[in-house]
């Protein structure tokens, strides 16, 4: 079927080329994409078996959910996949689909992503679709190029430096599932951390809102003084168990994230008088650690083994820490660290 689609769309493109050479480039692309979309819909959804909104968003299917509909100011955890009109997938947050497509990578996170509603940080087409959905629902849409841009007025108002030019020059199909609607992101994270604590570390108190720490073994003597150095081993995870970083070679191999070009050696940490000065925000060099990790280190001494878990404010924040290859930590991720300190070397 995809072969027929490609041939049909190719024919449309050829005819458009001969009759629209005199048009401006942006007008030409808009016209081309409109005709390609029309051809695709005529072939695959004859008889207008789809819905077109006033903005031009195409809704191919909609399975209604039973939960809350997100509104501006909410957060929405979504799973989604993106593909071109000829059926080639370009991105997916679904692990099983990535495996089927042969593009799965253990270094890439597969799970729901948080979309912020009403801040101009998602495309106009995605915003419109999510605001028509309810929690638990699924929708397949086509976002044309003019709806792939961000709402500049909103992201400028909220202080985000986001380009409002279209993010795509072609029509894209989005398969979306609205997993969870969140009115208050940090209340949701607080509740999630408490549930995680109750399951894995019952009885551990939060020493400060959004932060938990438990020493599993070692001494309870004074912490390491300023200007001393400790050798640190760690495993960094999300709360669902996804390992995003470690300096332990065997652990990296176990979770499929081993990189032969990386050096799996102990992290040499120079201690300061406060954990704030050891964090990336407080260190003079700007090369410190995320706040939650720095706070945990400051609570440990030589030979200790401890765990800590905390909300995204003490981690990588709203932007996350995503690498060029797509791996890393998504925005608004709660983090968990398993930390070991070597004994002091004299």
Each PLM stretch: what is its role?
Residues 21-346:
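Cross-family detector of peptidyl-prolyl cis-trans isomerase
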